């Protein structure tokens, strides 16, 4: 269509943030200021540190006719009644199998339209649960990556209708099988092109890696309540606690 949409912030007359964009921008600014100060111990010429994000969008595809027969799906985006299917994800055969041709057609159409909008989608594959799939982009600056994810979810619904599908983005639409997570892979980089969480070839670079790793671990330890706050909604709480990633606790794993 001919509409021009652009992200904006929403604040009150007295300056309080009334949306999700303003707190994100403030958080990114705080990370930039703190990380730049630490960088000056190693690289005095660094002027800015950028937070990069690579999200993973998981989703279920359901045939439109089957979707229309389920009022719970229509009203809530998840099943509220019924019985578990005879076959779920016991053998992981969907995860390691080929993508159905009809789904591939949807994915290709989605990717073309996403790229036309500047969304750098890169991967497509099956997920663990039956009829569950995933797409993921190349890393971007975090603020832009969040905008692109919101835009992609809206685009997915429109493209799915063209192919006779309904997209389910609820965290746990079906009982007994995996739900859909939105994993956030993030990193910090400088305006001079240095990946701060990457190991280096010199002792100085490795010291920088250790320092930023320790700072990240300490941040998780001190502020785990704040990290949990934005994801503690009913849908996500319903999904977590089984064998899915991540678990229902905050943890740090160094690989």
Where do the language-model regions lie?
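Glycine-rich, acidic/polar active-site loops that bind/position phosphate-bearing ligands
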Residues: 1-169, 174-255
